[in-house]
Amino acid sequence: MAFAIASALTSTLTLSTSRVQNPTQRRPHVASTSSTGGRLMRERLVVVRAGKEVSSVCEPLPPDRPLWFPGSSPPEWLDGSLPGDFGFDPLGLGSDPDTLKWFAQAELIHSRWAMLAVTGIIIPECLERLGFIENFSWYDAGSREYFADSTTLFVAQMVLMGWAEGRRWADLIKPGSVDIEPKYPHKVNPKPDVGYPGGLWFDFMMWGRGSPEPVMVLRTKEIKNGRLAMLAFLGFCFQATYTSQDPIENLMAHLADPGHCNVFSAFTSH
């Protein structure tokens, strides 16, 4: 719910350049060729580790990036700096910088929720087909009996989500104000990046701390999968409303009879 970022490349180049430009810097005595190789390996390891400690800003997409309509010209406010920017804004909704920033964060959080929702629908249905659970149906899950009554669950969810969303809102207004990563006085600390908290809890594999270009690739993959998940969830809602069936059940029926079991048959049968 809570939703990495100076340049690792710059950090690496700075460390390397400082060694070249400061020849008077004291170095440990080298006794043999093998120890020289070991020292160089240790220096390279230090450089790599130093780069991993600073999260990277996304590398903006080039001017010739793919656009939603080939041959079109993107609006000036969509300059390729946002993940998943294909120049699509026909109504000019993102012309205001503050509004564009809000839209980007709103799309990001809705994408993540949609990916969680689609996963939470598909996996239980697969488990039901494998015989691990019985009588699963995601669209009437709210009417089931749980360990507490619906009012208690609703209040608990509102309190927990309110706390997390409040912190996310504070981070949007003042980036880094709710950062939970520890700061070290003798190390280059990552700068805050709204929507990508990183750290042990949200980036334990440190994928968001590479060089800028791979970071942009990963974030673009996330937003593209999130957009697909939002469309998938709308499709699940449509299926549940018109067929009262689950997604995999609808998929199996469509594969068995594509000509008669499709989206058009849902309209003609009602």
From Swiss-Prot:
Annotated positions binding chlorophyll b 1: 68
Details of cofactor binding: Binds at least 14 chlorophylls (8 Chl-a and 6 Chl-b) and carotenoids such as lutein and neoxanthin.
Location of region: Disordered: 16-36
Residues involved in chlorophyll a 4 binding: 225
Residues the record lists as binding chlorophyll a 6: 254
Organelle transit peptide: 1-33
Name of the protein this chain belongs to: Photosystem I chlorophyll a/b-binding protein 6, chloroplastic
Organism: Arabidopsis thaliana
